[in-house]
């Protein structure tokens, strides 16, 4: 939880750590729900009784996504990472305590291809304004990194990105 990290800050500081990077800590869907697909006609076959799978023998496959590299609600801290009902206050307290101890908070964000670039910039600005995060590690293709680096607010943060377009 965010509070558990806050409690470990003295230990992290003693180790000489100056920056923590949080994997996606914004709200995202944890339950992986498989998409139903319809087989094309050329893949359909005439089944026989012995070929059928009995419904009681099929076990549901539950997959939990703890990583966060999926589309998300980029404007809210992850509620399940909070030990209280107020994830926003708990995250704010984490960043504040890091700063009091001379440490920085960098957040990792994954944005899906084709996402509105203005929403991306707005989300990053939001986390700087609301929570005072110190930087971002951006994941995804064709992100507005140049615009972020030139933005009045975001230009004062650290930006990590590995998919720069060649000139």
Go through each PLM region and give its residues.
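The feature marks proteins involved in alpha-glucan
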Residues: 1
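Aromatic- and acidic-residue-enriched carbohydrate-binding clefts of CAZyme catalytic domains
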Residues: 32-100, 111-130
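Active-site-proximal helices and loops of the catalytic beta/alpha 8
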Residues: 42, 69, 101, 123-125, ...
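Short amphipathic alpha-helical segments and helix-helix/interface helices
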Residues: 9, 92-95, 145-150
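Secondary-structure transition into beta-strands, especially the periplasmic turns and strand N-termini
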Residues: 16, 100-103
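Catalytic domains of carbohydrate-active enzymes, especially glycoside hydrolases
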Residues: 5-26, 62, 130
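Short, solvent-exposed turn/loop segments enriched in Gly/Ser/Thr/Pro and often Arg
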Residues: 21-30, 109-114, 139-144, 163-166
